[in-house]
Amino acid sequence: MATARARAALVFVALLQMAAVVVVRASHVVYPELQSLEAKHVDGKLRTGYHFQPPKHWINDPNGPMYYKGLYHLFYQYNPKGAVWGNIEWAHSVSTDLIDWTALEPGIYPSKTFDEKGCWSGSATVLPSGVPVIMYTGIDPDERQVQNVAYPVNLSDPYLREWYKPDYNPIINPDGGINASAFRDPTTAWYGPDGHWRLLVGSKVNMKGLAVLYRSRDFKKWVKAHHPLHSAHTGMWECPDFFPVAVAGGSRHYRRGVDTAELHDAAVAEEVKYVLKVSLDLTRYEYYTVGWYDHATDRYVPDAAFPDNDYGLRYDYGDFYASKSFYDPAKRRRIVWGWANESDTVPDDRRKGWAGIQAIPRKLWLSADGKQLVQWPVEELKALRAKHVNVTDKVIKKGNYFEVTGFKSVQSDVDMAFAIKDLSKAEEFDPAWRTDAEALCKKLGSDVDGGVGPFGLWALASGDLKERTAVFFRVFKANDSSHVVLMCNDPTRSSYESKIYRPTFAGFVDVDIAKNKQIALRTLIDHSVVESFGARGKTCILTRVYPRKAVGDDAHLFVFNNGESDVKVTNLDAWEMKTPKMNAEE
């Protein structure tokens, strides 16, 4: 990512090289000799304690999340036969609280001609009658990606254990100039004022990503619109998501989710904007825009303030992909799920017997100023908090650090706030850095002394600090005398293992730090995951790490400051986290 065309070309080459190292697995490169080798042993040393994952084998995209008859449902892409991608079906789990999960029988699996070579990602739509419907991408005998529908066998069953696929599938074929090998991941459908249902399917034409729009009166026959809902020159769009969010100026309850069914109310419709999120197959990042949607013309126009390209805002600046949101009617909120892939190697995954987790489900809403989305772990997560320690008003001078003791940090929730009294020592900010936070983080890592910062946490650290994952802030001074805050997750020293992929992840934080000279950081630590939320959820970064020494009781937590300006930890609350019921069979 860069501002100059020539530099952008170099970065593009680098991204391709990066993909060759690790991302190809996320792009579903097939290992025929490995995909059906069942794990005989599951190595639990680095398995997460409270993040969602099945007992063994490969998982990827979250699919069809919904709430039905008192239960949260999550389907997800799963290989029942091995720890690499292949044999994909929709595994199915249910929960009453988004924390404890029970595994059920697979919801959708290859069983018909129209999906005999795979059941890929999709979404759930709850019809006005209360009937839930799954729409998903099937791979047919000709390797075409087609869109199919499935209905519950028994609507009185809150577990929705069985699904049937009507014979009139596929309901959408890749006709009319659509690339049959790049046509997948249908969205949740929405009902328009003209009596038509609408949904999007991700696709591309050359390097242009497309959100292809389809309409239907009966949810059976779907007709392609003359134009996509939206497009941009970013490469293939996977896992599109399109949904309304409340605007603060129009509602006192702007943090609530908005159900598309409510949009028939004209007053509600005037108080919302729309979010279009896409997952970029080329870079394996996601980005989103916020804008206006015209129901009459079926046009979506992003607000000018939102970059409509791969420099755009992201849900998460780390290892977070193929996200899918849903409206939770029980608590009137929108929740987003995201897949966190492994960063180790295929042999490592086979040895472990598992690969992939889901990020902690997050509540999502539009910020009060309308400039970005904000995310925060669902409130139910607090039920797992156990032993607690607290630190207050502790000043850290340049080059100093302290250990947070009295609890086990390897599976923990750490919520803290920093105060910076003196911002005068902030380094000058080069405007060219604005489009490449990751490169800036890599250049100015946690061990590079600065003016204001770097300051933050060393998580999953060994006692001698030779292994550690840094989560930190660094403050710069811009030409207009405002301040720019950089947030980084730096795993370059996270493990003695040399063959794993350890990129720095970073994003800028939209906060006026000069106003109150404070910034908050919450970090969820879970054996091989460091999931951080800066400035109360304005910037989120998830990192996968694989320490060799900093495991179990040998994992430590430190707070550090390598900046000239003193930093005060005004408050730090840390909790050990209990292990919930995680996908044991009913």
UniProtKB/Swiss-Prot annotation:
| Endpoints of the signal sequence | 1-26
Q: Can you supply a Gene Ontology BP term from the record?
A: carbohydrate metabolic process
Under the heading PROSITE patterns, the entry gives:
GLYCOSYL_HYDROL_F32
Give the location in the cell.
Secreted, Extracellular space, Apoplast; Secreted, Cell wall
> Do you know which CDD domains this protein is assigned to?
GH32_Fruct1-like (cd18624)
Instruction: Kindly give the InterPro entries that the UniProt entry links to this protein.
Output: ConA-like_dom_sf (IPR013320), Fructan_Metab_Enzymes (IPR050551), Glyco_hydro_32 (IPR001362), Glyco_hydro_32_AS (IPR018053), Glyco_hydro_32_C (IPR013189), Glyco_hydro_32_N (IPR013148), Glyco_hydro_beta-prop_sf (IPR023296)
Q: Which residues bind substrate?
A: 58-61, 77, 85, 120-121, 184-185, 238, 281
Cysteine pairs forming cystine bridges in this chain are: 441-488
E.C. numbers: 3.2.1.26
Q: What are the annotated glycosylation sites?
A: 154, 179, 341, 390, 479
Single GO MF descriptor = beta-fructofuranosidase activity
Which residues are catalytic?
A: 61
Q: Which SUPFAM superfamilies match?
A: Arabinanase/levansucrase/invertase, Concanavalin A-like lectins/glucanases
Keyword set, alphabetical order: Apoplast, Cell wall, Disulfide bond, Glycoprotein, Glycosidase, Hydrolase, Secreted, Signal
* Tissue specificity statement from the Swiss-Prot or TrEMBL entry: Weakly expressed in flowers.
This protein's record includes keyword Transport: no
Does the entry feature the keyword Secreted, yes or no?
yes
* Gene Ontology cellular component annotations, sorted alphabetically: apoplast
Reactions it catalyzes: Hydrolysis of terminal non-reducing beta-D-fructofuranoside residues in beta-D-fructofuranosides
- State the family it belongs to: Belongs to the glycosyl hydrolase 32 family.
Identification of the protein by name: Beta-fructofuranosidase, insoluble isoenzyme 3
